[in-house]
Regions:
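Helix N-cap at the start of a conserved alpha-helix in ABC-type nucleotide-binding domains
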Residues: 74-76
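Conserved ABC ATPase signature
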Residues: 38-42
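Catalytic Walker B motif of ABC-type/P-loop ATPase nucleotide-binding domains
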Residues: 63-66
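Conserved catalytic motifs of ABC-family nucleotide-binding domains
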Residues: 59
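Hydrophobic anchor residue at the start of the ABC signature
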Residues: 52, 80
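Conserved ABC ATPase "signature" region
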Residues: 5, 9-34, 86
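ABC transporter nucleotide-binding domain
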Residues: 82-166
């Protein structure tokens, strides 16, 4: 993957260590079978892996990841999460900042999170549990049905233990 050699050079990795550093990234992200392929021919998931490899090469103190597992199947997503978790735990030398639309991903990978509204206004900041305790007042479920029998719907609602009006 020429991309990784290029970014290793940009990040100042000495020439005598580049191959070793690139191989380490390739192995971390399970890209061994794709090392000789052009980036444009990789699947979407492998392109995500390559993007993360570019971000982590050279062990920078701050790693920025934009939706690192978006569009991945569940198995690939879990793999990516384990990679990100290992990076953030590695000698506590790198801080990982990521953006995501997935609360599940944020909870799996973050010790602190901020929630933005309209692309820029932070509404809350803290641990997942702090945010839930402070801002979560429940859930709203909206169901659209073609034909309604209000008695059956109320019975179903009661079976689920839900409160509120239909």
């Amino acid at each position: 993957l020429e991309h990784l050699k290029f970014y290793a050079t940009i990040k100042g990795i000495p020439e005598n260590r580049r191959e070793e550093v690139v191989e380490d990234c390739i192995n971390q992200l399970n890209l061994m079978d794709h090392r000789d392929k052009p980036a444009g021919t990789l699947s979407g998931g492998n392109k995500r892996k390559l993007s993360v490899a570019v971000a982590i090469i050279g062990n920078p103190p701050i790693i920025l990841l934009d939706e690192p597992s978006a569009g991945m199947d569940p198995e690939a997503r879990r793999f990516m999460w384990s990679v990100v978790e290992k990076i953030s735990q590695r000698d506590k030398k790198s801080a990982v900042i990521l953006t995501t639309h997935s609360m599940e991903e944020a909870e799996a990978l973050s010790t602190k999170m901020g929630i933005m509204v309209r692309g820029g206004i932070f509404r809350c900041y803290g641990s997942s549990q702090h945010i839930k305790n402070k801002y979560a007042t429940g859930y709203e479920l909206e169901i659209k049905i073609r034909k309604s029998n209000i008695e059956e719907l109320n019975d179903f609602k009661n079976q689920l233990g839900l409160q509120g009006d239909l």
